[in-house]
Amino acid sequence: MVDREQLVQKARLAEQAERYDDMAAAMKSVTELNEALSNEERNLLSVAYKNVVGARRSSWRVISSIEQKTSADGNEKKMEMVRAYREKIEKELETVCRDVLNLLDNFLIKNCNETQHESKVFYLKMKGDYYRYLAEVATGEKRVGVVESSEKSYSEAHEISKEHMQPTHPIRLGLALNYSVFYYEIQNAPEQACHLAKTAFDDAIAELDTLNEDSYKDSTLIMQLLRDNLTLWTSDQZDDEGGETNN
């Protein structure tokens, strides 16, 4: 029998060493023990996979950019090599995303009871995120499917968060941040993105007195990111120049 506490300890250690693949493997094993995760364990799982998938997302963007330049140069041999490398990174990214989505569907979301609104929103947001990461690299029918799944997860999380969580809650704010990025980057719907981000920001500002001392820093940081994205997106709509979105 694997010692749960030892696995969690290993994940903490791996995080300090910035060995995120090890961290993810440890937290995957914890999740597969099929017991509810504590807030700390939930965050360890999230941080581990965010870094594992983040490295692949970053690599994919770099290689895609090189692929476009190589295509313009017309160097067939180099083009073939770059394409093959992009596809290799894509496969890695897809494997990581499918791993997370399996954990969410088979254990984490499934085991949330009717009163665990915070956990349910956290996991549904995560599900929306990992389908969004798949949508970033998918094309054709495959893309349509993952976009639909992402939208469905975000939408369900959004409804629960509006009904059961304070507008200043960092999980509700983080969901609004990522859901609005989904509208802007994946759905190419800047008006919906701006509306969602602005509503979340304004609702939180209106209830600043409900800010929990423990989560004050998290909440205000996400509010700042929402505002930064709004500023970027509204200026983009005015001059149509791209920029780097916070997500």
From Swiss-Prot:
Site (described: Interaction with phosphoserine on interacting protein): 57, 132
Localisation: Cytoplasm
Pfam (any one): 14-3-3
GO cellular component, one term: cytoplasm
Tissues expressing this chain: Expressed in brain, gill, heart, intestine, kidney, liver, ovary, skeletal muscle, spleen and testis.
Protein family (similarity comment): Belongs to the 14-3-3 family.
PANTHER family: 14-3-3 PROTEIN
Function comment: Adapter protein implicated in the regulation of a large spectrum of both general and specialized signaling pathways. Binds to a large number of partners, usually by recognition of a phosphoserine or phosphothreonine motif. Binding generally results in the modulation of the activity of the binding partner.
Name assigned to this protein: 14-3-3 protein gamma-1
Organism: Oncorhynchus mykiss (Rainbow trout)
